[in-house]
């Protein structure tokens, strides 16, 4: 394939490992994965945890909500939100090769009335007033091809993210890397959302830590979270009961 990308954007490749297809950005690091025999299934634990916002809304309300992904990856979250949850879904991706790969190799549907993929700089696009207050579930996974640190990771960026959310909206962020960089990222998120709004998971075995931030801090009773988890598991096949056990507020 001949690239027409600017020099700063990495080349996109994929590799197959049995029934699992991986997306790479000019490196060995995996940027996303798909089961070729079950393309809507969420393969990695951290990707599943990016759906933990489901614990904080009534399951019956999910199809009428709006999900947004900053960073397309292998389109796992975008496909799941659109096809499985039946949500209006918007994804913002900088690299046109990633979008082409997702459409060609990772079963991402074409845009339609409920699905829109924008080729844009996420940090700039989310400052557009048309998005403010419209997003119920914001999922942020913005890493460069070396997976060293988030590309956008300052307090102003997280404040812009919060401005996107509906009153009961949530943001989930994938943080990967050293404990020192994780701690800095959490403090920046807390500065934008408030410490009482932060719910961090423990790191997965692969080193990914998902942090959930609520637009408005709440403390749902554990019984309600468990009830919703049962519904999430039976309706959408996600390990939500495990989330309830390991997801704790930063400030009790």
Describe every region a protein language model picked out.
Residues 31-33, 39, 105, 173:
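Generic secondary-structure boundary/loop-capping signal
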Residues 5, 17, 23, 38-167, ...:
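The AdoMet/dcAdoMet-binding core of the Class I SAM-like
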Residues 155-220:
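C-terminal substrate-binding/active-site "lid" region of AdoMet-derived donor-dependent transferases
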Residues 86-88, 112-114, 168, 195-197, ...:
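A generic structural signal for alpha->beta connector loops
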Residues 28-32, 143-146, 171:
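A short, flexible beta-alpha/helix-coil linker loop
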Residues 28, 122, 203-205:
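Residues that form or immediately flank small-molecule/cofactor binding pockets and catalytic motifs
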Residues 1-18, 22, 30-37, 45, ...:
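SAM/dcSAM-binding transferase cores
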């Amino acid at each position: 394939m001949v690239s027409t990308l600017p020099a700063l954007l990495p080349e996109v490749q994929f590799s197959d490992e049995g029934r699992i297809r991986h997306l790479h950005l000019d490196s060995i690091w995996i940027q996303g994965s798909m089961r070729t025999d079950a393309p809507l299934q969420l393969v990695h634990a951290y990707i599943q945890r990016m759906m933990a916002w489901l614990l904080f809304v009534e399951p019956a309300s999910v199809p009428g909500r709006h999900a947004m992904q900053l960073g397309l990856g292998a389109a796992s979250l975008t496909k799941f939100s659109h096809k499985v949850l039946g949500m209006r879904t918007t994804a913002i991706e900088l690299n046109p090769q990633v979008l082409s790969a997702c459409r060609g190799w990772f079963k991402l549907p074409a845009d339609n009335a409920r699905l829109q993929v924008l080729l844009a700089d996420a940090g700039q696009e989310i400052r557009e007033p048309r998005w403010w207050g419209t997003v119920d579930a914001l999922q942020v996974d913005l890493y460069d091809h070396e997976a060293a640190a988030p590309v956008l990771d300052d307090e102003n960026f997280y404040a812009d993210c919060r401005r996107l959310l509906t009153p009961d909206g949530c943001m989930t962020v994938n943080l990967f890397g050293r404990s020192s960089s994780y701690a800095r990222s959490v403090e920046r998120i807390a500065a934008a959302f408030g410490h009482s709004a932060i719910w961090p998971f423990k790191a997965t075995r692969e080193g990914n830590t998902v942090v959930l931030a609520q637009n408005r801090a709440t403390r749902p009773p554990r019984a309600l979270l468990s009830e919703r988890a049962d519904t999430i598991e039976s309706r959408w096949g996600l390990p939500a009961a495990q989330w309830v056990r390991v997801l704790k507020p930063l400030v009790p």
